[in-house]
């Protein structure tokens, strides 16, 4: 009997509190709730983990040892599961060979298409390389004018130097009486001596004929003789019209002019991961590394003696004596600014003197001088040589700082070799197709019509390609190109690519578990994504989505709201059922926001920008940006909006952040191309807060990441008992010998390998999971040892450490960003993306800032519930009110409507985007008809504009630097009391 429900009893994974529930099968189920409430614990660590585990356990023990078997979730009973597929937000691959085309398998079909119906051409002459049979050659010639006379030629020698007397002897011996030498006809006995040092072409005249039906047999035999003599090549020249182009034939894939040939086409030839198809220069990576003059000349505003090129200034005696000798030879001043030196001098310094010999003066250790004459190697060739010859990893790492990447000059970044680049389908080579945006590629294949047998073969392949491209368009990725590297995709894009691949697979009866597929997607594209999810469901699958998007929740067949709080305060089912059930439930926070009982308010007044305090970025042209001029008001909260692929990340992350980090923080990022930047001196620090994990090992935790663990260990080292025993702060670290338990090396758990079963982690039987040895655990602060403290939640720890400012400040900021429920020693690998980002935000908040920091956040609302977003906005507005500048890339309309300033990019994604449509207040953007963001924003803003009376926190003194307004301790206390007030209101 078919089951209609997935029945779960007694689920206790992570923070789930023994929950029982029945989920309908073959429906679209949305699981929502606060960040950290237990949504992923239920969807991924319970339902998916058990579905996957059961499927894998049905395989043989031999097969299981090659698969990663998931840990058995902590629950009493579960039934009604299907084989499970999870589509998570993790980025696809860090392999530089992985592209959108290879992930979606579209590239495999393209390789097949080009191998089966592609037409190879000669790279130099453009002639089609078509192998013809003798019958085809004869038929072609018999179709010519019967009154014309022709001669059949077999090329024996092609463009080779020499007298070739031996060749003529051999032809004479074989019975040939006429030859054509360099275009002139001769009797074989009357050929003049050939010039030894000149190139010659010698063709044997095989036959002379008029094309008539009765000579078909003779002509076939002549062609066979000619092909044998000419090694598969034949030319037929008109005798009556010598100026006419010859008819060229080949029995193999080769050019009739230059003998360029190809073996039979096969899919491997078009793979940049196979030696037969990859460009030999870059091994199929498409990029070449080179020492970049812009990176080598670090400070072009300085002179060579003052350090324009690091390591070649006065501080390095050996290299500077070379520069001094160069200056004497080329008559320039070593103290002159690099930018003012003549181009010829700069060329010689960087690339060497070429053939020019220069007199160099060397100082010996004894104080003497020697003079030697030789060519100057050049700084860049010097770096290349040292990089090539060194065996020291440290030297190699140091030199890597000066290396940049550029498209491979041999293949122009296409990754393929010469042969693969010159095979055509409908007059288009493969590299030309993979650079098209997906929607244009789809149009090309829909309109593709090949004649004859090629069309029949191509039909099936083209259908598969078209379907897969269509799925990418459906999930809002029409702006991507197939050659886009996988490691440049955002988490949301990577997830939607996997989603498109799954729809392409067309499986039925499967359970899909998705993690926020709407991330990085503009409201405009949301409808198409939701259509894709319903399509997956309609195929006959159960689709379980962890999602906060309002449209997705409203569309779902079944909604599950987990809460009421986060962490230890969550793990319960607050409400479940249809949308109406959620709206009516008094316990459901989600229902309160959806019904309008609670909402994120629009500010009563907006902060005005100060025209004298604007950051100007001019002429940004990275990726798809079209000479963009960006103005960001200092001291305000600015939202960067626009449809997916419009250029937001390129403009902010690749251009603005890298530029500011290099200038202000002294970093060495590669900056996307731009013309100039003004007013960066408004800021003294730039901070990028993204959603990457705060640590990749289980030893990393919120206490270590925020820097709280150091004062914590110092505090324990000051306890009288610890001082009496002579314990240092290092004694209380679980990462070094001394205080940690050596049986488990401070992990608290011991891994037991089970081969084809999942590895089992058991608590260490020496320390019982406490990570420290007995002596260390005897040291107590107010009755708690170091292990007890790491097991505390942030709110409990704050009560304990309130009198210790260095620890309390860090704990207060964790509370401010809504992370009061996480444990201090919780493994970083168990934090969600939203939690990791807020831990980073809290770390920055806990630092004493000057009110002149530029904060850049990329989609901070990822993984956040409406209620979490409200708390996050409180933090961002607090940063802004202290005089800092906050720039947020965001699609969430609740964040956008509360911003002071919006920069909207578009109008579309990919090559149809890359321009700023409108900049201004939310009201100004909402009034802009061409802006998609404006259209959705207009529905959320009241018709009465917010009163724009209050000036920005730093606009009072236009000529002064942004002032520091509030001390962090006061801010933290104010925020804490505000949090308590909201908590009282909520209850």
From Swiss-Prot:
Transmembrane segments: none annotated. It comes from the Bacteria. Residues 948-987 are annotated as: Disordered. ATP binds at residues 33-40, 642-649. It is found in: Cytoplasm. The keyword Repeat applies. Residues 978-987 have a biased composition (Basic residues). One of its GO terms (cellular component) is cytoplasm. Keywords: ATP-binding, Cytoplasm, DNA damage, DNA excision, DNA repair, DNA-binding, Excision nuclease, Metal-binding, Nucleotide-binding, Repeat, SOS response, Zinc, Zinc-finger. Residues 312-589, 609-938 form the ABC transporter domain. One of its GO terms (molecular function) is zinc ion binding. A zinc finger (C4-type) spans 255-282, 741-767. Pfam families: UvrA_DNA-bind (PF17755), UvrA_inter (PF17760). Residues 958-972 have a biased composition (Basic and acidic residues). Belongs to the ABC transporter superfamily. UvrA family. The UvrABC repair system catalyzes the recognition and processing of DNA lesions. UvrA is an ATPase and a DNA-binding protein. A damage recognition complex composed of 2 UvrA and 2 UvrB subunits scans DNA for abnormalities. When the presence of a lesion has been verified by UvrB, the UvrA molecules dissociate. This is UvrABC system protein A. It comes from Xanthomonas axonopodis pv. citri (strain 306). The gene is uvrA.
């Amino acid at each position: 009997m078919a089951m209609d429900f997935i029945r779960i009893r007694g689920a206790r994974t992570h923070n789930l509190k023994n929950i029982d529930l029945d989920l309908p099968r073959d429906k679209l189920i949305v699981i929502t709730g606060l960040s950290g409430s237990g949504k992923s614990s239920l969807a991924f660590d319970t339902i998916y983990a058990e579905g996957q585990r059961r499927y894998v356990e049905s395989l043989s023990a031999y097969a299981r040892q090659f698969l990663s078997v998931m840990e058995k979730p902590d629950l009493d009973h579960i039934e009604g599961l299907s084989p499970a597929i999870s589509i998570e937000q993790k980025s696809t691959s860090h392999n530089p060979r992985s592209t959108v085309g290879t992930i979606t398998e579209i590239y495999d079909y393209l390789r097949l298409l080009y191998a089966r119906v592609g037409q190879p051409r000669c790279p130099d002459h453009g002639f089609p390389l078509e192998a013809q049979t003798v019958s085809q050659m004869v038929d072609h010639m018999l179709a010519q004018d019967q009154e014309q006379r022709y001669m059949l030629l077999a090329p024996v020698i092609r463009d080779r130097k020499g007298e070739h007397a031996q060749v003529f002897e051999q032809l004479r011996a074989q019975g040939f009486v006429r030859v054509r030498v360099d275009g002139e006809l001769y009797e074989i006995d009357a050929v003049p001596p050939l010039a030894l040092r000149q190139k010659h072409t010698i063709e044997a005249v095989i036959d002379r004929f008029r094309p008539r039906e009765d000579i078909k047999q003779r002509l076939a035999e002549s062609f066979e003789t000619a092909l044998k003599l000419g090694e598969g090549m034949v030319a037929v020249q008109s005798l009556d019209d010598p100026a006419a182009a010859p008819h060229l034939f080949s029995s193999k894939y080769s050019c009739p002019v230059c003998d360029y040939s190809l073996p039979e086409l096969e899919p491997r030839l078009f793979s940049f991961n196979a030696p037969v198809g990859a460009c030999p220069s870059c091994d199929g990576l498409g990029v070449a590394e080179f020492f970049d003059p812009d990176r080598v000349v670090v400070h072009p505003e300085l002179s060579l003696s003052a350090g324009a090129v690091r390591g070649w200034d006065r501080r390095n005696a050996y290299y500077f004596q070379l520069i001094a000798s160069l200056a004497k030879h080329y008559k320039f001043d070593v103290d002159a600014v690099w930018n003012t030196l003549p181009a010829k001098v700069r060329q010689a310094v960087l690339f060497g003197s070429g053939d020019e010999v220069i007199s160099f003066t060397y100082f010996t250790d004894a104080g003497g001088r020697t003079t030697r004459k030789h060519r100057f190697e050049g700084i860049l060739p010097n770096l290349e040589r040292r990089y090539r010859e060194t065996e020291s990893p440290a030297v190699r790492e140091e030199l890597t700082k000066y290396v940049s990447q550029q498209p491979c000059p041999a293949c122009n970044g296409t990754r393929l070799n010469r042969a693969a680049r010159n095979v055509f389908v409908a007059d288009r080579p493969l590299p030309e197709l993979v650079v098209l945006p997906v929607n244009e590629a789809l149009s090309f294949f829909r309109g593709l019509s090949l004649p004859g047998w090629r069309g029949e073969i191509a039909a099936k392949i083209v259908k598969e390609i078209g379907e897969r491209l269509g799925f990418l368009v459906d999930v809002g990725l029409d702006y991507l190109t197939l050659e886009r590297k996988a490691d440049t995709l955002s988490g949301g894009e990577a997830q939607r690519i996997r989603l498109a691949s799954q729809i392409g697979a067309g499986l039925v009866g499967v359970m899909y578990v998705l993690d926020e597929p709407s991330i990085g997607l503009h409201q405009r594209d949301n409808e198409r994504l939701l259509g894709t999810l319903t399509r997956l469901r309609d195929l006959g699958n159960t689709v379980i989505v962890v999602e906060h998007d309002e449209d997705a929740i409203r569309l779902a067949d079944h909604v599950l709201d987990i809460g009421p709080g986060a962490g230890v305060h969550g793990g319960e089912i607050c409400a479940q059922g249809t949308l109406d059930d959620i709206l009516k439930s008094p316990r459901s926070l989600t229902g309160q926001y959806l019904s309008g009982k609670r909402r994120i308010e629009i500010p009563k007044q907006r902060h005005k920008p100060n025209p004298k305090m604007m950051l100007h970025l001019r002429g940004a042209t990275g990726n798809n940006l079209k000479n963009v001029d960006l103005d960001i008001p200092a001291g305000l909260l600015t939202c960067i909006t626009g449809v997916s692929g419009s250029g937001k990340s390129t403009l902010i992350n690749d251009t603005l952040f890298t530029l500011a980090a290099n200038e202000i923080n002294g970093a060495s990022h590669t900056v996307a191309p731009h013309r100039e930047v003004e007013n960066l001196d408004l800021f003294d620090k730039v901070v990028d807060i993204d959603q990457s994990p705060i640590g990749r090992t289980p030893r990393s935790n919120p206490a270590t990441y925020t820097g709280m663990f150091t004062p914590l260990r110092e505090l324990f080292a000051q306890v009288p008992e610890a001082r009496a025993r002579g314990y240092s702060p290092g004694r209380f670290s679980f990462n070094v010998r001394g205080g940690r338990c050596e049986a488990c090396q401070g992990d608290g758990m011991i891994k037991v390998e089970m081969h084809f079963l999942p590895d089992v982690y058991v608590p260490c039987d020496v320390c019982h999971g406490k990570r420290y040895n007995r002596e260390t655990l005897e040291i107590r602060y107010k009755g708690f040892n170091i292990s007890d403290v790491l097991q505390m939640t942030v709110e409990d720890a704050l009560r304990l450490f309130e009198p210790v400012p260095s620890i309390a400040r860090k704990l207060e900021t964790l509370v401010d960003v809504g992370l009061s429920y996480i444990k201090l020693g919780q493994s970083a690998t168990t934090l969600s993306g939203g939690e990791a980002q807020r831990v980073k935000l809290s770390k920055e908040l806990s630092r004493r800032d000057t009110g002149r920091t530029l904060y850049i956040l990329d989609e901070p609302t990822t993984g956040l519930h409406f209620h979490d977003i409200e708390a996050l906005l409180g933090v961002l507005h607090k940063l802004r009110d202290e005089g800092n500048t906050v720039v947020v890339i965001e699609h969430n309309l609740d964040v956008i409507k509360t911003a002071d300033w919006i920069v909207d990019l578009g109008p579309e994604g990919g090559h149809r985007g890359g321009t700023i449509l409108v900049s201004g207040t939310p009201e100004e953007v909402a009034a802009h008809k061409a802006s998609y963001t404006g259209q959705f924003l207009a529905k959320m803003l009241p018709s009465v504009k917010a009163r724009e009376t209050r000036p920005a926190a730093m606009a009072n003194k236009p000529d002064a630097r942004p002032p520091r307004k509030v001390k962090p301790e006061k801010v933290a206390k104010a925020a804490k009391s505000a949090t308590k007030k909201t908590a009282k209101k909520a209850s």
